[in-house]
Amino acid sequence: MHNQAPIQRRKSKRIYVGNVPIGDGAPIAVQSMTNTRTTDVAATVNQIKALERVGADIVRVSVPTMDAAEAFKLIKQQVNVPLVADIHFDYRIALKVAEYGVDCLRINPGNIGSEERIRAVVDCARDKNIPIRIGVNAGSLEKDLQEKYGEPTPQALLESAMRHVDHLDRLNFDQFKVSVKASDVFLAVESYRLLAKQIEQPLHLGITEAGGLRSGSVKSAIGLGLLLSEGIGDTLRVSLAADPVEEIKVGFDILKSLRIRARGINFIACPTCSRQEFDVIGTVNALEQRLEDLITPMDVSIIGCVVNGPGEALVSTLGVTGGNKKSGLYEDGIRKDRLDNNDMIDQLEARIRAKATILDEAQRISIQQIEK
C-alpha cells in the first residue's frame, strides 16, 4: 500500500537482451550467473531453471572454450530465460555462440585481440541483433592504467570503460551496456557515478566479488542502493559466494526495499521483545519459505504486540498485530478478524494466498480494460 519511491531514473538508451528491455525506463532487470561447468549441460540447465523459478530476468553463462560453446547450444535449447555468454580472449567463441542464438555477449574489446577480430565480433552482433556488455573490473584493469594510476581508482575504471565505448562507437555499434565493477563499495559507486555522466548507454550494476551470503548482501545493498536511489542503473547482479538463487532473491529484496520494482511478499516484521504474543521470528521464517512461489506484490506486516502493530497494519496489504491468545488481522488497513496464535502460520499463509488471488484477478481485469 506504500507509494512507489520518488526516484528519478537516469535517462538511457533502450536495448533488448532477448525479450527483456533494458534502459529507457524499463523495469530494472535482475540477473545472476551460473557456477556450474558449462560443459555439464544437465547441471547448467537445472541451475538456470532454478534461477528462472525465483524470477531471474537474465542469466549469464561462462563460455571459456569451444567445447563450452557446443554445450551452450544445447543449454540454450532447453531454457526460456535470455542468456548472456561471458567471453574472453578467443573471438571465435563469440562468433560460435552468436550462431547458436545467444541473447547478449559479455566481452572486453581490449582482450579479444586485433582490430579485425573485434570488428568481426561487432559485425556479427550487428547482423544478428545481439547486444554487447562491456564489463570493466577493478581486478583486471589494463596494465598501462595500473601503471598510470598506481591502483584502481574511479578515474581508472572510467578511462578503461571509455576506451571500450569509443571502440564500439568507431565501429558504429550502439547496442551495448556497460559495467564498472569493483569489490570496494565506494570505488564502485564513484566509478558508476562518473560513467553515468559520460554516456547514455544502459548501465549494469554490481559490486563484484562482494563476499559470502551475509557480508556480500550487505555490501551489495549499500553500493547498489546508493546508485539506485540516485536513479543510476538499468540492470543488476548481486555477486555472492553462494547459491546463485540467493543472488536473485537479494536483488529483488534491494529493489523492493527502494520501492523500485515489486515482486512477491515484502515482509515487515519486528525484531521481537518480551512483549511479543506469538513466535514472530518462527512465523516470518516459515512464511518466507512457504510463499517463495508467490510473485504478487504485497506488503505483509507481522508485529508481535500492539505498540507498533496497528500502525504498520494500516499501511500494509495484510497485517497481524499480536494479542493475548489471538492476534488481530488487518486487510488494507481495516481490522477484519482474529487469528489463533497457536495456528498462526497456517492461517496467515491461507489468508495471504487468498489475497494474492484477489489482487491477481483485479490486475488481470485492469489490463483487459486498458487493452480494449
Curated annotation (Swiss-Prot):
Cofactor note: Binds 1 [4Fe-4S] cluster.
Pathway(s) annotated for this protein in UniProt: Isoprenoid biosynthesis; isopentenyl diphosphate biosynthesis via DXP pathway; isopentenyl diphosphate from 1-deoxy-D-xylulose 5-phosphate: step 5/6
Keyword Transmembrane in record: no
Role summary: Converts 2C-methyl-D-erythritol 2,4-cyclodiphosphate (ME-2,4cPP) into 1-hydroxy-2-methyl-2-(E)-butenyl 4-diphosphate.
Binding site for [4Fe-4S] cluster: 270, 273, 305, 312
Annotated GO MF terms: 4 iron, 4 sulfur cluster binding; 4-hydroxy-3-methylbut-2-en-1-yl diphosphate synthase activity (ferredoxin); 4-hydroxy-3-methylbut-2-enyl-diphosphate synthase activity (flavodoxin); iron ion binding
Annotated GO biological process: isopentenyl diphosphate biosynthetic process, methylerythritol 4-phosphate pathway; terpenoid biosynthetic process
Pfam families: GcpE
Organism in which the protein naturally occurs: Enterobacter sp. (strain 638)
Entry-linked InterPro entries: Dihydropteroate_synth-like_sf, IspG_bac, IspG_bac-typ, NO2/SO3_Rdtase_4Fe4S_sf
Superkingdom: Bacteria
Needed co-factor(s): [4Fe-4S] cluster
HAMAP family per record: IspG (MF_00159)
Cited PANTHER family: 4-HYDROXY-3-METHYLBUT-2-EN-1-YL DIPHOSPHATE SYNTHASE, 4-HYDROXY-3-METHYLBUT-2-EN-1-YL DIPHOSPHATE SYNTHASE (FERREDOXIN), CHLOROPLASTIC
Catalytic reactions on record: (2E)-4-hydroxy-3-methylbut-2-enyl diphosphate + oxidized [flavodoxin] + H2O + 2 H(+) = 2-C-methyl-D-erythritol 2,4-cyclic diphosphate + reduced [flavodoxin]
Protein name in UniProt: 4-hydroxy-3-methylbut-2-en-1-yl diphosphate synthase (flavodoxin)
UniProt keyword list: 4Fe-4S, Iron, Iron-sulfur, Isoprene biosynthesis, Metal-binding, Oxidoreductase
Lineage: Bacteria, Pseudomonadati, Pseudomonadota, Gammaproteobacteria, Enterobacterales
Enzyme nomenclature, EC number: 1.17.7.3
